[in-house]
């Protein structure tokens, strides 16, 4: 996840100062997996790209999300993903799980909105 700082700086520059949250981080990760598959396919032919995606196996060291990697099962789902939970704390998104990557301590129960 070493690239996340660089990606966040670029995102912040083009998003009005907002930090990267889960949706754009997952979109970036999916786009990078697709780019890798296109390179592996050596073609823009959809069937070649599909085959490359079926065989893709990306390790966690090149991702900006805390997945264990990217590898698609027979159902087309990533078998190496895991949940990432965020809370809004002090007006900003903050990762609270997985605990080993948490940027903020989980607040539970969440305080009432005033």
Stretch-by-stretch model annotation:
Residues 1-114:
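Extracytosolic ligand-binding ectodomains
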């Amino acid at each position: 996840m070493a690239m996340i700082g660089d990606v966040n700086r670029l995102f912040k520059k083009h998003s009005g100062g907002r930090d990267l949250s889960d949706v754009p981080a997952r979109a970036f990760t999916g786009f990078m997996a697709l780019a890798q598959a296109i390179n592996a396919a050596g073609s823009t032919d959809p069937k070649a790209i599909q085959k490359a995606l079926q065989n893709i196996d990306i390790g966690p060291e090149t991702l900006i999300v805390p997945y264990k990697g990217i590898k698609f099962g027979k159902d087309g789902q990533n078998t190496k993903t895991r949940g990432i939970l965020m809370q809004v704390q002090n007006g900003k998104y903050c990762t609270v799980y997985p605990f080993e990557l948490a940027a903020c301590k989980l607040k539970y129960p969440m305080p009432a909105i005033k």
